[in-house]
């Protein structure tokens, strides 16, 4: 069998040739067909009717029947729909064929139906051949339709004139492979290049009319021209003779099907002079388009079938196929209904393409080409494949992404899907608008790696994967709980370690875990800085567990008091319950009730007890305000109105002691001294109260929970006592005031009140000291009592600090400080205040005893070997610091009396001499530095006080004088004797005139002035016994002086010829010292003689003689001094 295959050559303009899109035939072809076909006239009407019905069913853009001139005019324009009432078809991406039997969508022509009924026999034969073809091609009876083939059928006359071609003549007619048009975009589905289209069509005697109303194809198709796999078979085109049986078929495929060999003659049969155009099908969807299924149903009589199109994706395929065929006038057009039915039964299997894809990717010499095989001969013609540069620029992923999201699956069985309802236009548009889901990891293959992927059945929403899942949250929760448990265990272990720190240290020292060398290093570099405490240790006065043992806010009932109310407000208060009374008091009813009427002492005592025991500080303060109001109102009535009915209730020592005992204090701790005891005992106080066990237990349990004493109760008691002592100065006697003073100072040492401000204590003590009548006598008792309140030196400092800053308070501080100093140094109080005035001289005997070394010796002797040396040293400096603090309090003067100026100067020198100089600082003993710093501050304070003090009486200025023990005894007579040397015994040292002239005049004047001052001093000269005796002995003195001058002339003459420089050079230092010793011995002898002579000489003569000798031997003495200086130099 001869056949003709026409293959398009590569064009110089990248193949962008305007293809012909019409299915019409030229005039010469028409004549040949009319001559050769005898059934042309009979089948013409039937063909026209079928084509018209096909156009209505498919609703493709542009009609199938258009004139040839219209096709040429609209060749490069986009196709538009012939049905104006459905513009949505312009955006449709699928070919859809509506069922003919749907009356709601289409209108059928009865004439056309009649024509089709006449041609029933012809359609039946076509159906049979299609069934035979399905059984021969594949077991499933269907082949795959490639959606990536881009080809177009065109007529030959106009095409051949514009484009060169290669003809292989087998018969009188030929098949032409033409390029698809380039102006159709995304009109069809785009599939891989290895897809196969297999069509079997029977030759019909009915000749369809030539139509030019064919839709134009995409403009991107020329870019994909001749894209076929090198290993795939090209389209096989065969033609039968003119008088052959009425069957036509065209087979175009790119891959080899082992189940349907390419040599089967029945796959492609074309009548003579017939031409057929195979439309290009393109899968060119964007990612936002969803796969759609087009189903086209036909007649129920079996004349038509459904076309099934399937697409497959390939990540490495850019090659396209284009196969164009021509059919005879007796053959149906490919766009007709019969052709669609035949094409629907052909579908290619997916696994047939995988071997070829892998082979193509592995072939390094694979060149894109189109292979055309002529059936009946073993020749294969390969033509080079053209690839558009734009596709190269876009890359592989562009086509792959589009193909991944585009799937069309149509059924191949017409009988099983004829009655199914097709999707509506709205559903199709919704598919296009729907946003695609992010593809999964395996949706795309690796670049340039052709891997067979199964066609996804449908687009499904990917399951959202959250980062924090329930299991992770549970794991995090468990981990958090474990960390919390670990933290709790660590905290507990830290607390246990802190509690057992001392035990561990002792065990380590016993076990000798640390070596001796390491222990020495630790001792060497250890630092002790907390030896001197800033807060006093205190003493336990109150026991929190005993708080409220006598009464509490629940047992105190105002209704038990038998008093007569004076007004309605008092009656309401006295008859109300305890909890209601407190509310009424807070509302101010108590002050209103007793503002104009006197308050009964029982009510005031009840209020005093309630404010000392109520746990609520707000209620306690309001009760205290009511007490203040009642007391001030009573005092006002007493002073202004002289009313005898009003009285200020002042709590007695007994009431005060009861309150303190109820707060948890013991009787012995309040009154520890035997010399100072109240007139009542603890048993007397307990007889007045019979506490209820329940209330007592509840109150004690509340205090145990708090574990601290309520400070507001103590402040309320002290505040009311201060008010009472201020309003009634004579309410207490001196003995009671001393008891109150001792109790308040004792309470001030409570450990729970260490950080409590001293304002409340100081205010009460100020009123107590002020109310003492016999102050001069009671001050010594007060000093003795307060000194014995504690044995700790820091607690005694605390007692001194809480005393007020009033005049009596300062005086008591000074005397008490000295008393405590004497007690600490002498172990007994040896100081007894003699009067109200304090003298600084009382501190002089104690300062030398405050030396740290002396304190260390006393402590070591008292305690023996109980403590180590380091501990004793710390205690010694701690005691020294306390003693210095008391000394500072004793010398705390704002203006020092001038009479005590010398005493303060003496104390300053003693402080610096005995204490400051005795402290040896060390980097390991910072407490020593603290003591030394405190000494320096005290010394500076005293010096400032000295500058602010007036000088002594009768003096304008007060100069510094050394202390008496530092003054050296000086005898003016000895100084004059040293100066008055005997010139006869030291002739060598007599000065020459040259040496005398070298001295400056200023030195002479200064010496003369000193001598004159010494002579003018009356203490140095003895009184003249008799002026007459002095005149008689004057002559004898002159004679003696003249003799002395004659003796002094001899050494002067000898010294004139003496070379001093040479003599000094020859004389050594040892000889000079020996000469000096000889001179001193001679001077001593001369002095002894002079003293014997002075006994018989009058004073005036002696003075005159001394003056003459000094004037005469002045030069000699100066020369002697100069020689000694030169010798030493």
Curated annotation (Swiss-Prot):
GO cellular component: nucleus
Extent of Polar residues compositional bias: 93-110, 169-178, 324-343
GO biological process: DNA repair
Region described as Disordered: 71-178, 312-343, 955-1057
Pfam families: CANIN (PF14816)
UniProt note: phenotype after gene disruption: Slf2 depletion in zebrafish embryos using CRISPR/Cas9-mediated genome editing or morpholino gene knockdown results in a significant reduction in head size and aberrant craniofacial patterning in the pharyngeal skeleton.
Function: Plays a role in the DNA damage response (DDR) pathway by regulating postreplication repair of UV-damaged DNA and genomic stability maintenance. Promotes the recruitment of the SMC5-SMC6 complex to DNA lesions.
Protein name: SMC5-SMC6 complex localization factor protein 2
Source organism of the structure: Danio rerio
């Amino acid at each position: 069998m001869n056949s003709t295959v026409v293959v398009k050559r590569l064009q110089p303009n990248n193949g962008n040739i305007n293809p012909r899109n019409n299915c019409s035939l030229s005039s010469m072809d028409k004549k040949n067909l009319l001559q050769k076909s005898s059934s042309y006239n009979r089948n013409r009407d039937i063909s026209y009717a079928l084509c018209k019905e096909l156009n209505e069913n498919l609703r493709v853009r542009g009609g199938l029947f258009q004139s040839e001139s219209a096709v040429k005019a609209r060749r490069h324009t986009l196709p538009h729909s012939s049905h104006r009432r459905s513009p949505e078809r312009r955006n449709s991406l699928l070919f859809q064929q509506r069922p003919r039997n749907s009356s709601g969508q289409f209108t059928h022509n009865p004439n056309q139906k009649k024509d089709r009924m006449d041609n029933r026999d012809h359609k039946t034969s076509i159906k049979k051949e299609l069934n035979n073809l399905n059984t021969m091609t594949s077991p499933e009876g269907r082949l795959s339709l490639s959606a990536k083939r881009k080809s177009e059928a065109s007529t030959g006359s106009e095409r051949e004139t514009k484009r060169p071609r290669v003809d292989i003549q087998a018969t009188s007619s030929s098949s032409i492979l033409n390029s698809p048009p380039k102006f159709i975009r995304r009109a069809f589905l785009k599939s891989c290049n290895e897809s196969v289209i297999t069509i079997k069509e029977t030759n019909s005697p009915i000749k369809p009319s030539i139509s030019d109303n064919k839709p134009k194809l995409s403009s991107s198709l020329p870019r994909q021209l001749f894209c076929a796999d090198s290993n795939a078979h090209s389209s096989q085109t065969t033609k039968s003779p003119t008088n052959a049986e009425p069957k036509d078929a065209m087979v175009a495929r790119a891959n080899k099907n082992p189940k349907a060999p390419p040599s089967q003659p029945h796959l492609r049969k074309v009548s003579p002079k017939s031409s057929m155009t195979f439309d290009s099908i393109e899968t060119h969807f964007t990612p936002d388009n969803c796969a759609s299924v087009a189903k086209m149903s036909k007649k129920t009589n079996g004349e038509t079938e459904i076309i099934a199109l399937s697409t497959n994706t390939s990540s490495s395929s850019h090659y396209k196929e284009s196969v164009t065929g021509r059919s005879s006038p007796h053959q149906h057009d490919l766009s007709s209904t019969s052709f669609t039915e035949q094409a629907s039964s052909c579908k290619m299997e997916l696994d047939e393409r995988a071997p070829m894809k892998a082979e193509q990717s592995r072939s390094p010499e694979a060149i894109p080409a189109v292979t055309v095989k002529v059936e009946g001969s073993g020749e294969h013609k390969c033509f080079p494949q053209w690839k558009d540069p734009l596709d190269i620029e876009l890359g592989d992923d562009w086509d792959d992404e589009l193909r991944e999201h585009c799937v069309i699956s149509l059924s191949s069985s017409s009988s099983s899907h004829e009655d199914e309802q097709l999707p509506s236009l709205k559903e199709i548009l919704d598919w296009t608008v729907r946003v695609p889901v992010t593809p999964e990891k395996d949706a795309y293959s690796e670049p340039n790696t052709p891997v067979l992927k199964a066609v996804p059945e449908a687009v499904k929403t990917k399951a959202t994967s959250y980062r924090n899942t329930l299991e992770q949250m549970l794991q995090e929760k468990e981990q958090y709980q474990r960390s919390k448990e670990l933290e709790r265990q660590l905290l507990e272990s830290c607390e246990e370690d802190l509690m057992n720190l001392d035990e561990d240290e002792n065990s380590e020292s016993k076990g000798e875990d640390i070596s001796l060398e390491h222990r020495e290093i630790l001792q060497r570099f250890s630092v002790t800085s907390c030896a001197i405490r800033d807060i006093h240790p205190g003493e336990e006065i109150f026991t929190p567990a005993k708080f409220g043992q006598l009464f509490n806010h629940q047992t105190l009932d105002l209704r038990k008091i038998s008093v007569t109310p004076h007004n309605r407000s008092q009656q309401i208060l006295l008859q109300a319950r305890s909890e209601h009374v407190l509310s009424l008091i807070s509302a101010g009813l108590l002050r209103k009730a007793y503002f104009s009427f006197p308050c009964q002492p029982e009510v005031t005592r009840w209020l005093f007890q309630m404010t000392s025991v109520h746990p609520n500080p707000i209620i306690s303060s309001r009760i205290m305000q009511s007490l203040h109001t009642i007391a001030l109102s009573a005092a006002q009535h007493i002073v202004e109105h002289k009313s005898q009915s009003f009285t200020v209730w002042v709590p007695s020592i007994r009431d005060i002691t009861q309150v303190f005992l109820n707060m948890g204090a013991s009787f012995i701790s309040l009154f520890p001294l035997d010399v100072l005891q109240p007139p009542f005992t603890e048993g007397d106080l307990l007889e007045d109260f019979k506490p209820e066990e329940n209330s007592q237990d509840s109150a004690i349990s509340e205090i145990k929970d708090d574990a601290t004493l309520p400070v507001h109760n103590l402040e309320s008691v002290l505040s009311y006592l201060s008010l009472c002592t201020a309003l009634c100065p004579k309410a207490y006697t001196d003995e009671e005031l001393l008891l109150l003073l001792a109790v308040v100072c004792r309470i001030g040492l409570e450990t729970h009140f260490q950080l409590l401000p001293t304002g409340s204590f100081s205010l009460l003590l100020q009123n107590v000291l002020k109310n003492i009548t016999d102050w001069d006598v009671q001050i010594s008792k007060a000093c003795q009592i307060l000194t014995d309140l504690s044995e700790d030196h820091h607690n005694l400092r605390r007692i001194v600090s809480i005393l007020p800053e009033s005049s009596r308070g300062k005086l008591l501080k000074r005397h008490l400080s000295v008393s405590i100093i004497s007690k600490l140094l002498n172990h007994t109080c040896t100081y007894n205040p003699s009067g109200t005035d304090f003298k600084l001289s009382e501190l002089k005997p104690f300062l030398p005893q405050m030396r740290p070394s002396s304190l260390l010796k006393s402590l070591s002797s008292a305690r023996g070997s109980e403590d180590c040396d380091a501990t004793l040293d710390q205690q010694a400096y701690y005691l020294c610091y306390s003693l210095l603090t008391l000394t500072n309090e004793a010398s705390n003067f704002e203006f020092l009396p001038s009479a005590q100026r010398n005493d303060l100067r003496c104390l300053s020198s003693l402080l610096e001499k005995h204490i400051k100089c005795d402290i040896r600082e060390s980097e390991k003993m910072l407490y020593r530095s603290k003591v030394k710093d405190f000494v320096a501050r005290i010394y500076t304070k005293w010096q400032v006080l000295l500058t602010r003090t007036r000088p002594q009486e009768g003096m304008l200025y007060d100069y510094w004088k050394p202390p008496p023990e530092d003054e050296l005894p000086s005898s003016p007579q000895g100084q004059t004797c040293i100066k008055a040397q005997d010139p006869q015994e030291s002739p060598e040292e007599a000065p020459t005139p040259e040496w005398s002239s070298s001295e400056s005049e200023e030195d002479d004047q200064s010496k003369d002035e000193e001598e004159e001052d010494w002579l003018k001093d009356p203490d140095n000269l003895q009184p003249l016994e008799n002026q007459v005796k002095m005149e008689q002995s004057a002559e004898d003195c002159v004679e003696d002086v003249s003799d002395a001058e004659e003796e002094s002339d001899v050494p002067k003459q000898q010294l004139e010829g003496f070379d001093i420089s040479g003599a000094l050079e020859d004389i050594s230092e040892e000889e000079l010292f020996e000469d000096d010793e000889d001179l001193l011995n001679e001077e001593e002898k001369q002095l002894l003689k002079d003293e014997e002579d002075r006994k018989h000489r009058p004073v005036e003569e002696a003075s005159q003689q001394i003056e003459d000798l000094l004037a005469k031997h002045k030069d000699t003495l100066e020369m002697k001094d100069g020689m000694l200086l030169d010798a030493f130099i």
